[in-house]
């Protein structure tokens, strides 16, 4: 094997050249109206492929055409998640950790986001310094030692001792801002730019002293949103200048230049403009690992703007793209088992990966039976909810849809060419470091679909129920 070719891609090339013929295909399924949840529902044999007709519905995978690597797939541990987790019985805590982070028997989360001090998904606003302490002499993460840090450490342990972890701030402390509040937007006062930059470095050092390695940071959560919770506005030019004149140099001087800095961290709608302003400035771009984005641009109506992910990927191919937050808002217990919520996840994961994303991070991993706690009442869905009165855990369809990606597509995998012949099916495929090929196929229609599954020159026959998702694995 050419040592320059990743093992996963080399194995995939073998599949593309016809070596799948005679191999076994595992079909794992989650389907509405059935008990199937990440269930191995069938095994199929590959045979030599034949030319499909126009009337056939087919999925085509060409493993010889490889694209971006996978950083990971996971979710966020917020104060809310940690507070709900702490109320669970020990056996239920272990069940949740096992379900999320065990790569063999759970869904193998490999990416984790957390917050720099409070967000709306905290029981109250707080910071790590005393009011007015621009020198950061009072800096302490003692608040997080009660709930969040213990859960983070247990998640890392459950994941086998390593999980790629990054952190995001929702707002600078009130005294550093133009509106003198952590809430309702406002912007960073110029005279506190260096102090705020040093705040990130103090956070990283403090968390690492607690045993939580920080891989990277985003500069600002949702920098164009004035929210009734913790929020702070950065125009594109403001974020560019803060990065190149303050945060980047301060991180480098602190010996943290190897930590990744992620810009934007907001919706797909404005990401091309933000990329142009920051990535086309060489003094800023040198500090930026890439761009984070969210999925909430549909708040104004219209469809998800996946094409903007592709536009940034094509224009700045040296920059990395990462979905940093997604959640279904407007919690309603009657929709807890909604497959529409799950299909929103499936559609976004497939399209974000197909347009160049290297990782995908859901929002809260766990919330209570009201979609909280949230100190401003912004209650949302999570893949798992816990009843704070009974301790009962509810695993939603969204958990299993996320698992169809995270369980079978592992860090270091490379996306490979995949397409469907009809719009009734959506698909993406990855070749894993262990040589396995994982293809996700989703049917969001009201009818089951029989389809031909082609891998290179070989094919197998597969059926997918209505409102279902499958992961097809060739080992």
Which ranges hold each PLM region?
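Hydrophobic h-region of N-terminal signal peptides that target proteins for export
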Residues: 8-19
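Bacterial N-terminal signal peptides that target proteins for export
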Residues: 1-7
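A short small-residue
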Residues: 180-184, 223-228
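Substrate-binding and catalytic surfaces of secreted/luminal carbohydrate-active proteins
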Residues: 23-40, 46, 51-61, 165-167, ...
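Short, well-ordered, mixed-charge alpha-helical segments that flank or form enzyme active sites
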Residues: 173-177, 225-227, 270
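N-terminal catalytic cores of secreted or lumenal carbohydrate-active enzymes
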Residues: 35-214, 235, 241, 245
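Short, solvent-exposed turn/loop segments enriched in Gly/Ser/Thr/Pro and often Arg
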Residues: 113-120, 168-172, 218-222, 265-268, ...
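A short, flexible beta-alpha/helix-coil linker loop
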Residues: 79-83, 224-226, 328-330
């Amino acid at each position: 094997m050419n040592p320059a070719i990743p093992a996963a891609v080399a194995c995939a090339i073998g599949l593309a050249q016809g070596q799948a013929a005679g191999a076994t295909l595992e079909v794992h399924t989650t389907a509405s109206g059935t008990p199937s949840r990440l269930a191995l529902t069938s095994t199929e044999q590959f045979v030599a492929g034949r030319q499909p007709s126009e009337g056939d519905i087919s999925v085509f995978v060409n493993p010889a055409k490889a694209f971006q690597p996978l950083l990971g797939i996971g979710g966020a541990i917020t104060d809310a998640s940690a507070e709900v987790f702490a109320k669970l019985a020990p056996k239920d805590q272990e069940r949740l950790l096992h379900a999320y982070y065990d790569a063999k028997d759970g869904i193998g989360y490999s990416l984790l986001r957390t917050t720099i001090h409070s967000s709306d998904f905290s029981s109250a606003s707080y910071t790590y310094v005393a009011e007015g302490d621009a020198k950061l002499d009072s800096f302490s993460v003692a608040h997080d030692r009660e709930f969040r840090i213990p859960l983070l450490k247990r998640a890392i342990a459950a994941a086998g001792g390593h999980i790629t972890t990054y952190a995001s701030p929702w707002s600078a402390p009130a005294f550093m801002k133009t509106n003198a509040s952590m809430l309702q937007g406002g912007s960073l006062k110029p005279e506190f730019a260096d102090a705020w930059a040093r705040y990130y470095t103090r956070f990283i050092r403090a968390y690492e002293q607690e045993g939580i390695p920080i891989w990277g940071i985003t500069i600002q959560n949702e920098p164009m949103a004035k929210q009734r919770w913790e929020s702070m506005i950065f125009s594109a030019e403001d974020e560019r200048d803060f990065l190149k004149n303050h945060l980047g140099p301060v991180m480098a001087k602190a010996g943290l230049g190897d930590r990744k800095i992620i810009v934007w961290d907001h919706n797909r709608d404005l990401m091309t403009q933000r990329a142009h302003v920051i990535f086309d400035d060489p003094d800023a771009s040198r500090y930026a690992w890439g761009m984070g984005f969210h999925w909430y641009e549909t708040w104004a109506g219209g469809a998800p703007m996946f094409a903007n992910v592709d536009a940034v990927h094509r224009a700045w191919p040296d920059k990395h793209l990462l979905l940093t937050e997604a959640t279904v808002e407007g919690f309603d217990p009657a929709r807890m088992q909604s497959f529409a919520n799950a299909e929103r996840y499936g559609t976004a994961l497939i399209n974000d990966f197909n347009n160049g994303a290297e990782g995908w991070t859901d929002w809260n991993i766990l919330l209570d039976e009201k979609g909280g706690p949230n100190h401003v009442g912004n209650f949302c869905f999570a893949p798992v909810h816990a009843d704070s009165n009974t301790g009962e855990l509810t695993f939603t369809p969204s958990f299993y849809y996320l698992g169809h990606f995270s369980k079978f597509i592992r860090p270091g995998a490379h996306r490979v060419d995949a397409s469907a012949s009809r719009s009734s099916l959506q698909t993406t495929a990855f070749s894993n470091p262990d040589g396995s090929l994982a293809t996700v196929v989703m049917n969001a229609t009201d009818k089951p679909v029989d389809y031909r599954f082609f891998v290179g020159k070989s094919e197998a026959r597969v059926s997918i129920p209505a409102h279902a998702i499958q992961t097809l694995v060739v080992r």
